[in-house]
Amino acid sequence: MAENAIADLNVRPLKTVVPHLSHDAEFFPGMVKKWGLGCMLSTEPFPGGRSAGSLAWAGLGNTYFWIDPARGIAGVILMQLLPFADPKALALLDAFERAV
């Protein structure tokens, strides 16, 4: 689950096809990310947040989790809010992760 499953490919920006359900989203722009089996994998540390080797997922209702094995922590924040990648939800996610 926490191993690169897409070889040399990288996670690209998520472009919406249903704007009333989701905004376009790109988590940690400019940083290399991979897909594992069921999660996004970080290949480098994110500023103010998780370590390289961390895994994460996001759901349509602005539900998010991450696991950082190097630091021995995990975080879960669940909202029921549309559209996905709502700017206020992303700001709350960022503040929550920085606080942990």
Where are these regions (language model features)?
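Catalytic loop of the DD-peptidase/beta-lactamase superfamily, centered on the K-T-G motif
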Residues: 1-100
